[in-house]
């Protein structure tokens, strides 16, 4: 078993507090070291996604303490539609949607999901990054749909990671540990 130095123990404590959404503890630890960075309140965010999001869960919890994440591998936009439907009126103020890696993006389904969420919540659509001909068309569709709605923004994961392929696992699709932070910060920047 690895022995923790006092500094490593504090870092571990901070990481666990952030991952578990203990916002007050994170803020207190930040202020003890003179850090004034504040994260968006994760308790106001629901996130739904596929394997891209699964790989980024710890980073998302770090950047958005308290975020509610519903992510599973091999999900499609139709699964996102069902998840949003199940959440119903309990959806939080902001919603992140990250689907399309496995089966492409169908405009009717994306529109149905956004209609269900409604115009009163902020929504972030995450672009896909895969080495397939459909990638450009799918991402163009997401950008176009977002432009048509005042409450929808795009987190351009494809552009962010295309310039940083070292942030991907060997499969060239899923984020590495460092890539998970790039994924989360791309969402945060949207």
Short names for language-model regions:
Residues 135-190:
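Catalytic His-Asp segment of secreted/periplasmic serine-dependent ester chemistry enzymes
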Residues 119-122:
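A short helix->loop->beta-strand "cap" motif at the edges of active sites that frequently abuts
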Residues 1-46:
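N-terminal secretory targeting modules
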Residues 38-112, 130-137:
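Conserved SGNH/GDSL esterase-like catalytic core that processes O-acyl groups on lipids
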Residues 46-48, 124, 153-155:
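Hydrophobic/aromatic beta-strand patches that form the interior of the parallel beta-sheet core
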Residues 93-116, 148-152, 174-186:
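A broadly tuned preference for mixed-charge, low-complexity surface segments
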């Amino acid at each position: 078993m690895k022995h923790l130095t006092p500094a490593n123990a504090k870092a571990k404590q901070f990481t666990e507090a952030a991952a578990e959404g203990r916002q007050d503890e994170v803020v207190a630890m930040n202020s003890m070291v003179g850090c004034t960075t504040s994260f968006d309140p994760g308790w106001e965010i629901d996130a739904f996604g596929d394997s891209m999001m699964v790989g980024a869960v710890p980073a998302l919890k770090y950047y958005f303490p308290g975020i509610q994440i519903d992510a599973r591998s091999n999900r499609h936009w139709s699964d996102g539609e069902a998840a949003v439907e199940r959440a119903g009126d309990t959806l939080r103020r902001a919603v992140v949607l990250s689907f399309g890696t496995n089966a492409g993006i169908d405009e009717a389904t994306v529109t149905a999901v956004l209609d269900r969420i409604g115009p009163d919540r902020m929504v972030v659509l995450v672009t896909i990054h895969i080495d397939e001909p459909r990638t450009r068309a799918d991402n163009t569709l997401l950008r176009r749909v977002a432009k048509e709605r005042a409450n929808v923004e795009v987190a351009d994961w494809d552009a962010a990671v295309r310039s940083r392929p070292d942030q991907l696992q060997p499969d060239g699709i899923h984020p590495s540990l460092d890539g998970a932070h790039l994924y989360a910060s791309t969402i945060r920047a949207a």
